[in-house]
UniProtKB/Swiss-Prot annotation:
One of its GO terms (biological process) is mRNA catabolic process. Residues 562-644 form the S1 motif domain. SMART domains: CSP (SM00357), RNB (SM00955). This is Exoribonuclease 2. It is found in: Cytoplasm. It catalyses: Exonucleolytic cleavage in the 3'- to 5'-direction to yield nucleoside 5'-phosphates. GO terms for molecular function: exoribonuclease II activity; RNA binding.
Amino acid sequence: MFQDNPLLAQLKQQLHSQTPRVEGVVKGTEKGFGFLEVDAQKSYFISPPFMKKVMHGDKISAVVRTEKEREIAEPEELIEPFLTRFIGRVQVKDERLAVVPDHPLIKEVIPTRPQHGVDQMFQTGDWAVAEMRRHPLKGDRQFYAEITALVTRADDHFAPWWVTLARHNLERAAPTMPEGVSLQEDGPAREDLTALDFITIDSASTEDMDDAIHLAPAPNGAWVMTVAIADPTAWVPAGSPLDNIARERAFTNYLPGFNIPMLPRALSDDLCSLRAHERRPALACRVTVRPNGTLADDARFFTAWIESKGKLAYDNVSDWLENLGSWQPETEAIADQIRLLHDVCLARSAWRQRHALVFKDRPDYRFVLNEKGNVDDIVVEPRRIANRMIEEAMITANVCAARVLRDGLGYGLYNVHHGFDPLLVDQAVAILHSHQIEVDPADLLTLEGFCALRRRLDAQPTSYLDSRIRRFQTFAEVSTVPGPHFGLGLDAYATWTSPIRKYGDMINHRLLKALIGVGDAERPNEEVTLRLAERRRQNRMAERDVGDWLYARFLQPKAGSDSRFAAEIIDISRGGMRVRLLNNGAVAFIPAPFIHSVRDELVCSQDTGTVQVKGEERYRQGDTLDVTLAEVRMENRSVIARPV
């Protein structure tokens, strides 16, 4: 009787339109219920039965109902699923396959089967790539996924690498060397510098050596520095298949234990690498460095043949300069080059301290792995004098390239950083004012004003203020037009010194060569800058994910013990504090209840970067404290710490 009743249909439509609805993102919990987060301030409870229809991270619309004076959300429509392509672990039960996503807040056991063409037999614990095919909010009865690839087997000790690379859709191996690749020479003949005593300084294990340096004394206490950089663009013409591969990869991917090169290893580790006692093509920059650290306006770029006279290691060179250890340079000529480079480093560093900015030295942490991929040790490698010598030479060369490209072409690939966000600078000024540092907002938006503030902050006893105002700064980015780099305190900066490892540096090589009659200049487009930024983000996330996994493996035996670790507070949020363990670099989380058990007496404030207990400040960002490890959660590779 009511089947086609227009009044009833109208009433249904009216009720539907009057029912309040919201859009938001589902946040799962480990207890079965969840929340629909509409914005930073507003969220709605989702009961366990309704959570079975959605997943953590799904963007949905939901009906809002009130039950027992509490607003709850009932999922109604899927706007954007959180899971599309994902990595998971296979479960096999009664010959039926399921996959559990590798995500800390997604525990759904999703029915699955391999898609057509995936022929492997799967076993419980295997890692796989899967794609979602069905979702309850799309009218399907249940979640369902298809396995599109096997990542690795359950017992593979190298799973951290393969799973991470698959998660970020990154290559597992070096590109293959195409047939017929040869050195392409056009334009002016290369200058023969093979008689000069060039040296390379790098890590002892490095094979892909980009840079070699030669120094000669000049009148009035100056130095003539020649920086020779590997010349892969002589082997890789623009637009060639190999160039397309390099553009796609964008960078060599450095992960703990090994790297995945941007170019075939025959090029990156051999034909292009500036190996000792091997004649190699190079793009060179020669510039005069004055005794006060300034650069003369005589930078000249040219192609050359060079022969490195020694592959030196950072630690050996540093030890020798600091009169430590037994290592000695092979020849007096190499010793002279080290001394000259040391002198130039001191002059340039002093100039940058006064007129630009110098980053604070932070140690590197190196995983020592055995043949099974397990971590035997984590070694702290402080940045020493030899590292700084190479850094100063490369910064000098990049400044020269930035100026030559700016004046000669008006474009290139520039690293730019504009300091404070103009929309947020007043907040930074207010924080500085509360700490008795008076600055003018307009000054902070200039390169000079930014540098002056950074020097004042670097002189502070702790990093607290620096970390507080860092969030009001813009991010560094790659631009096709010249611009300042506030973080370095320089008016222009364009890198070209790592072309074996960075595609952006290859582009700048081609532009610099065009200015000296080798090839044509083609202005890079915005698509390239976006690709470089995206690939850099992917590689950094991959390095972090592998590192987190290895840290969890390494620290798991110490969880629950009395072992103490010195740690620095790097972030404070409502839920607790993130700290970095200083003797190995691992990041751990200290939950708020571990700081103080009475929640109402505890305030963890991200805005002030402090932790207060009963109104008294107990911790602030940048403080160091001792912690023990309460727990290591292997399922999400996280470390939970407790203050001592």
